[in-house]
């Protein structure tokens, strides 16, 4: 995995220690990542979920926009489920 993807993954893991709901886009923006391809988002998400099995991936889509117009990068939320 490339360094920038590892930075995102490590930041997600740090955020998971204090938050039950993690907005993927906000975490990426906080470390300076402006965009990721969908495949890269999926790789990071799968690695995070494997290491944190209590989290689930949810895609929040705005009610006034079609799902085709919104990327996984901007809409992915990792939510802790017990």
Regions found by a protein language model. Give the residues of each.
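Nucleic acid-binding interface residues in structured DNA/RNA-binding domains
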Residues: 1-9, 13-16, 20-82
């Amino acid at each position: 995995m490339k360094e920038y993807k590892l930075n995102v993954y490590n930041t997600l893991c740090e955020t998971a220690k204090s938050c039950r709901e993690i907005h993927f886009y906000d975490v990426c923006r906080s470390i300076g990542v402006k965009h990721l391809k969908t495949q890269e988002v999926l790789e990071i998400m799968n690695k995070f979920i494997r290491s944190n099995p209590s989290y689930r991936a949810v895609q929040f889509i705005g009610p006034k926009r079609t799902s085709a117009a919104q990327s996984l990068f901007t809409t992915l939320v990792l939510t802790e489920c017990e």
